């Protein structure tokens, strides 16, 4: 069967952009909570990480297969909190004076944010190129 979808690459890129949007939101949340020593659940904030998965639809017909990227889940980073000696801090351990800070590195988060931004830009370029190709195909069909 002939597929009329002339922008399959754009569909894949659009789904990847949506997934990267979630990743950027989680990164922003991590940066905002980089110094949160006490959460409502108790203890310091834990860094969150977005996991992606690729979905292939119509995999038995390679010419019509649709690939999508979506968020598989958001997990807590298992690294331990940073311990900092600050005996005057309200959340300091009374015996040791150590404060548990989140396992968030702002430098790492900024690097991840740049990576996510570049992935979004690349996917936007794919959509633009697919659109241009479709427009040229339609122009050829007219002429």
Q: What are these model-derived regions, one by one?
A:
Residues 1-143:
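Amphipathic alpha-helical polymerization modules
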């Amino acid at each position: 069967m002939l597929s009329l979808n002339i922008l399959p690459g754009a569909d894949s890129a659009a789904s990847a952009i949506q997934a990267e949007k979630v990743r950027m939101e989680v990164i922003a949340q991590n940066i905002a909570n980089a110094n949160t020593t006490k959460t409502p659940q108790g203890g310091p904030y834990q860094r969150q990480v977005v996991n992606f998965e690729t979905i292939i639809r119509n995999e038995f017909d390679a010419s019509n297969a649709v690939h999508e990227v979506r968020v598989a889940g958001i997990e807590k980073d298992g690294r331990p909190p940073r311990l900092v000696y600050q005996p005057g801090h309200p959340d300091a351990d009374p015996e040791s004076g150590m404060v548990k800070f989140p396992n968030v590195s702002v430098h790492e988060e900024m690097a991840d944010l740049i990576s996510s931004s570049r992935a979004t830009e690349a996917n936007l370029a794919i959509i633009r190129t697919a659109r241009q190709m479709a427009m040229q195909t339609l122009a050829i069909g007219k002429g």
